Curated annotation (Swiss-Prot):
It catalyses: D-ribulose 5-phosphate = (2S)-2-hydroxy-3-oxobutyl phosphate + formate + H(+). Its cofactor is Mg(2+); Mn(2+). It comes from Salmonella paratyphi A (strain AKU_12601). Catalyzes the conversion of D-ribulose 5-phosphate to formate and 3,4-dihydroxy-2-butanone 4-phosphate. Keywords: Lyase, Magnesium, Manganese, Metal-binding, Riboflavin biosynthesis. The keyword Thylakoid does not apply. Binds 2 divalent metal cations per subunit. Magnesium or manganese. Mg(2+) 1 binds at residue 38. D-ribulose 5-phosphate binds at residues 37-38, 42, 150-154, 174. Its EC number is 4.1.99.12. Pathway: Cofactor biosynthesis; riboflavin biosynthesis; 2-hydroxy-3-oxobutyl phosphate from D-ribulose 5-phosphate: step 1/1. The gene is ribB. This is 3,4-dihydroxy-2-butanone 4-phosphate synthase. SUPFAM superfamilies: YrdC/RibB. The lineage of its organism: Bacteria, Pseudomonadati, Pseudomonadota, Gammaproteobacteria, Enterobacterales. It comes from the Bacteria.
């Protein structure tokens, strides 16, 4: 990742701390991966406190595939099968079947309905019957071990939520340009600035976790 582009957001460790502060304040974070990987930026928000306005922003400026990052334990709790048995996607992204809240939604498409679905899936004591399948929210199962196991946006989202003190569940969506192309780092950074989001890279988070876990041991 081009460090010059990111320099205004501080050092790698400062960027992680600023991202955690942003999440705790209810703001979004732009998570960038490497140019050699997907080369994309994902908007992420805490699933517990994401607002309808933030969901609307995500739908308006994102790919349209609004994802809920969850752990394997939560996937089992909700009895969500993986979308396919044999995952042949380039990065092994862990999609489960799609979901809709069983109550409190109309068609499930609106920003408010998608927030309702997210809340239904992550509430304490959530049961499989709280969700209909299929739906308009795409759960993503994170790998155990987070970014130290798999350097994906899914794992980064779970790691950031956990470090910020939230339940391990977050909403993500890839940022797109107005012409429908994928936003790359310069566009992602500009968008984050316009919408008061912190910016962090997966590489930053890997280094941060490694350093802190070394200290702890």
């Amino acid at each position: 990742m081009n460090q010059t582009l990111l320099s205004s957001f501080g050092t790698p460790f400062e960027r992680v701390e600023l991202a955690l502060d942003a999440l705790r304040e209810g703001r979004g974070v732009m998570v960038l991966d490497d140019e050699d990987r997907e080369n994309e930026g994902d908007m992420i928000f805490p699933a517990e406190i994401m607002t309808v306005e933030q969901m609307a922003l995500t739908i308006r400026h994102g790919s349209g595939i609004v994802c809920l990052c969850i752990t394997e334990d939560r996937r089992k709790q909700l009895d969500l099968p993986m979308m396919v048995e044999n995952n042949t996607s380039a990065y092994g992204t862990g999609f489960t079947v799609t979901i809709e809240a069983a109550e409190g939604v109309t068609t499930g498409v609106s920003a408010a309905d998608r927030v309702t679905t997210v809340r239904a899936a992550i509430k304490d004591g959530a049961k499989p019957s709280d969700l209909n399948r299929p739906g308009h929210v795409f759960p993503l199962r994170a790998q155990a071990g987070g970014v130290l196991t798999r350097g994906g946006h899914t794992e980064a989202t779970i790691d950031l939520m956990t470090l910020a003190g939230f339940k391990p569940a977050g909403v993500l969506c890839e940022l797109t340009n107005d012409d429908g192309t994928m936003a790359r780092a310069p566009e992602c950074i500009a968008f984050a600035g316009q919408h008061n989001m912190a910016v962090v890279t997966i590489e930053d988070l890997v280094a941060y976790r490694q350093a802190h876990e070394r200290k702890a041991s």
